[in-house]
Amino acid sequence: MHAQGFLCSKHAMSEPIRLIVGLGNPGPDYETTRHNAGFWLADRLADDLRATFALEKGFMGMVAKARFEGENVLLLKPITYMNRSGQAVGALARFYKLAPEQVLVLHDELDLLPGQVKMKQGGGHAGHNGLKDIQAALGTPNFWRLRLGIGHPRTLNLAQQVADFVLHPPRRDEQAEIDTVIDRCRAVVPALLRGDFAQATRQLHTA
C-alpha cells in the first residue's frame, strides 16, 4: 500500500474520508468504559469493511487497512492513551499525505445523551483531551467528528465526577442506546467514504 494511493483529485467536490480514528484507551481495564465508545464503533466499522486491526508500533496504534469501492481506507485505534491520541493520528496522516478534511474521528460526547449522535467538521474540543491533542497534531480543527452521546453524570442524575464517569461502563439501558447509535453511524459511513457529506448528515440526523 503506497502513500500516494490515498491522494484524491483536487477537482473533487468534497474530499472523501480516508482515515477513520476511533478514540479510547488501550487495554482490558478500559474496554467497556464510556470513554472507549470510539473504539467500539471503529471495531464494528472494521468488521463492515472486512479489515483486521494489527499493531503498527511506528504509528503508535492498531491499524486496519481496507478497500472501499477501489479506494484505500485506514482505520486507527491509538494505543497512546486518550490524552496523546494526536501522536498516532498525526504520524499516520503525515505518512499517507492525508488532509485533515479526510480524517474522521469517532469519540464519546458528554454533551449528548446516550442514543444521540451528531456529525460536524471543525469546532472546539470542549475539554475532550483526545480531540485537543489531535487538533494540535494536525495544526487545525478542520477534521470531521462523529460525536457519540454518553451523557453527563449531571444529566443522568449520577453523583460521579466526570473523570470517574467516563472510566466506568454505561448502565445497561445506556449501553443499548449507544449500540443503536453505533448502528446508525455504520449506515452512513459509506456516504462519507464517497465524500457525500450532505447525504450522510441527512441520514444521520433524521434517523
Curated annotation (Swiss-Prot):
It is an enzyme of class 3 (hydrolase). The record marks N25 as: Discriminates between blocked and unblocked aminoacyl-tRNA. TRNA binds at Y30, Y81, N83, N129. Keywords: Cytoplasm, Hydrolase, RNA-binding, tRNA-binding. One of its GO terms (biological process) is protein quality control for misfolded or incompletely synthesized proteins. The active site is at H35. The record marks D108 as: Stabilizes the basic form of H active site to accept a proton. PANTHER family: PEPTIDYL-TRNA HYDROLASE. Monomer. This is Peptidyl-tRNA hydrolase. It comes from Bordetella avium (strain 197N).
